[in-house]
Amino acid sequence: MRPLLCALTGLALLRAAGSLAAAEPFSPPRGDSAQSTACDRHMAVQRRLDVMEEMVEKTVDHLGTEVKGLLGLLEELAWNLPPGPFSPAPDLLGDGF
């Protein structure tokens, strides 16, 4: 069982590096049903993890876009606010003082 786990770990590392993009998918020998069941479960878990990773990446991209949009709105609102008692005096000369 240990060599199988080592082999699967090696394949996972190669897959993560993109080395197996053109290679054929791994198909274990069907001699031992316990090994094939474990391998099938492992492959199912890997597929599910790939789906979850893709969903997380899409969610992060979406949230990043939303945050940028909200920050833009806040900046626009900040420029349109009337000056209050604690607001800095406007820089009429543009010299920063």
Swiss-Prot record:
It comes from the Eukaryota. Residues 1-22 form the signal peptide. Keywords: Secreted, Signal. Belongs to the PLAC9 family. One of its GO terms (cellular component) is extracellular region. The keyword Metal-binding does not apply. PANTHER family: PLACENTA-SPECIFIC PROTEIN 9 (PTHR37355:SF1). It is found in: Secreted. This is Placenta-specific protein 9. The keyword GTP-binding does not apply. InterPro entries: PLAC9.
